[in-house]
Amino acid sequence: DDVESRGLGDVYKRQVIFLKNILLIDFSRSHDMNKKVLLCSLLLSLPLVVSAAETIPLWPNGAPNKSTITEPETTNDKGAIFNVTNGRLEVNVPKNPNGKAIILIPGGGYGNLAMGTFNQSFIPYFLDQGFTTFVLKYRLPKGDPAIPLSDSLEAVKIVRSLFKKYNLHTVGVMGASAGGHLAAMTSVECSGDSCPDFSVLIYPNITMMQEESQPKSSCRNNLIGKDRSVKYDVAYSAYKHVDTKTPPAFLAVSAGDEYAGSLGSMLYTRAMVENARPVSLHVYPTGNHGWGIGKSEKFPDGDKFKDDLTAWLKDIK
């Protein structure tokens, strides 16, 4: 019963509930041997890779830029989290740690945190690869575009301060959609201990320039607003701030993405090349937007994406 208080991630809370229900089976009678065999099989099939998960607040003494959101935080039936005002990291430790950490940053167009694909796909994938995962539940902007970025920069600092505790030596950032934008901005706006060692940008909303943004995307309006001057578009277009210190990046996007588009990823890649920084861009012919790891009906190129990402991550020291 103390699992919830230890901050176990959503993916594994469901496992715990499942185990609690299984353990209610009456094994006291000898003819229940088949149930015992079934239980053992179920336990062996579960990806029990978590140890000592916890939740870490980003600003235990109060954030420097206060959110204007007053509504309570809520989660819908798809796992999307709304009205986030309490920035935090949720930690999951793999069964076979590789000494590397990754901060996972969900999307949601800066209007919510879309956790569905992360819970079902990205978190289990990185744990299986041996990464200690720190899921960033960042505060939503609602009129102040600096709020999410301050949370992500602080998150990198916090993870670095935990290297000894978790036996880590490297930390990267991974984001999808709006989370990809935030991961990219973290990579180009960081300094010192707030700088990640690498970035993984999945169908990222790289640009906030009006003429370069996808019409279907809500990122720009939710982050910057409709009426702000062009200086904000420039300030929050990540590719415009790439320099010779920007960390290595892996980018993946679908050619027909209607929400993030492939242009921003190409512009970021060009900026990395111009600054002689390591970069790997993968544009897939299928998938549109919102896919996860592995082949699916929505994303037939999913296995290729998984292989490309896995190979790239193996080169991270």
Regions from the PLM with identified roles:
Residues 1-15:
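Single conserved hydrophobic/aromatic residue that forms the stacking wall/gate
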Residues 53-96:
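N-terminal cap/lid segment of alpha/beta-hydrolase-fold proteins
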Residues 76, 204-241, 247:
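Mobile cap/lid helix-loop segments that gate and shape the active-site cleft of serine hydrolases
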Residues 99-107:
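Short beta-strand element of the alpha/beta-hydrolase
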Residues 113-122, 134-170, 295-302:
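Catalytic nucleophile-loop/oxyanion-hole region of alpha/beta-hydrolase
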Residues 154-215, 233:
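Primarily recognizes the serine-hydrolase "nucleophile elbow" in alpha/beta-hydrolase
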Residues 251-253:
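Short beta-strand/loop motif that positions the catalytic acidic residue
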Residues 258-264:
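Conserved alpha/beta-hydrolase "acid-adjacent" motif
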